[in-house]
């Protein structure tokens, strides 16, 4: 939690601890689905199978609505993907921003989506090039955004739902795909 008031740079180091840059990659709806399917494999803990929690490897895709039907077999857990209220077509192309850790293959997301890590033909923007090596780091981009905005009032927007059981999905009125 960041307290109200001035946000010194040290708070941004606490908020975003890694030295990352951003890449913009064009991905299809099917590649996004596979990416999210890979994330669903990280919702349990080996030491406690009843625990369904996140961590570093439970990626979300902001702006895309989707449902995680955890009870479904792997490969069929991501259902009802929509963008701007419309179903996502497998061949629909999206511009996706990811950090260099993901782009270079970190945690296997690129491979899971059928993409080759560090395939620079997939990207048309890298913040290290467009903003410079230091200014292009995520934490420095955040700092500049905060300076430009002067004041930030964070909001939370949920763009996905998680259903542990089929009964949970039905009770919520979700469209259950077998």
Where is each model-derived feature located?
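Catalytic centers of hydrolytic enzymes
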Residues: 1-178
């Amino acid at each position: 939690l960041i307290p109200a008031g001035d946000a010194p740079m040290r708070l941004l180091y606490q908020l975003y601890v890694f030295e990352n840059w951003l890449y913009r990659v064009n991905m299809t709806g099917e590649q996004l689905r596979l990416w999210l399917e890979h994330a669903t494999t990280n919702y349990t803990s080996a030491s406690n199978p009843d625990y369904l929690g996140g961590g570093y490897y439970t990626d979300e895709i902001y702006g895309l609505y989707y449902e995680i039907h955890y009870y479904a077999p792997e490969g069929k857990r991501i259902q009802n993907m929509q963008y701007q209220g419309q179903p996502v077509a497998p061949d629909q192309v999206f511009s996706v921003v990811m950090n260099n850790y993901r782009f270079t293959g970190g945690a296997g997301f690129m491979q899971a989506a059928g993409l080759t890590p560090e395939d620079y033909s997939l990207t048309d923007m890298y913040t290290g090039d467009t903003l410079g090596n230091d200014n292009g780091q995520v934490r420095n981009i955040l700092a500049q955004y905060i300076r430009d905005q002067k004041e930030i009032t964070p909001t939370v927007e949920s763009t996905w739902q998680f259903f542990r059981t089929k009964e949970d999905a039905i009770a919520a009125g979700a469209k259950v795909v077998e």
